[in-house]
Amino acid sequence: MPLYEFTFIAQQGLTQYELEGLVKGLSSLLTKNGAELLKYEYWGLLDFAYTIDKMNKGHYCMIYIKATPSSMDEFKRKVRLNEDVLRFLCLKKDKLPKGDSLMIQANQV
């Protein structure tokens, strides 16, 4: 199964509890379709370069997923319908990176 990097921005109005519920809901969608969640990172509540849907900030999150192309297509279709997700980007990757992402490393400095 191919490896995917799925990065999304959730609404700024979500509490940490609601954001955790959103991530659990997304991961259950994946596992229902036979996909496997390999890694999850929360990058924080960050400012936008421009306003999106009258919002200036959003919760940035990244998930590494091992899934079939058809299950990823279905997952992306359902994420588009979720009003809490403002934007997302799904990239196919060759391998899972070791350690934390650059965003996490930059926040630790």
Swiss-Prot record:
Pfam families: Ribosomal_S6. GO terms for cellular component: cytoplasm; ribonucleoprotein complex; ribosome. Keywords: Ribonucleoprotein, Ribosomal protein, RNA-binding, rRNA-binding. InterPro entries: Ribosomal_bS6 (IPR000529), Ribosomal_bS6_sf (IPR035980), Ribosomal_S6_plastid/chlpt (IPR020814), Transl_elong_EF1B/ribsomal_bS6 (IPR014717). One of its GO terms (molecular function) is structural constituent of ribosome. One of its GO terms (biological process) is translation. The keyword rRNA-binding applies. SUPFAM superfamilies: Ribosomal protein S6. Belongs to the bacterial ribosomal protein bS6 family. Binds together with bS18 to 16S ribosomal RNA. This is Small ribosomal subunit protein bS6. It comes from Ehrlichia canis (strain Jake). The lineage of its organism: Bacteria, Pseudomonadati, Pseudomonadota, Alphaproteobacteria, Rickettsiales. The gene is rpsF.
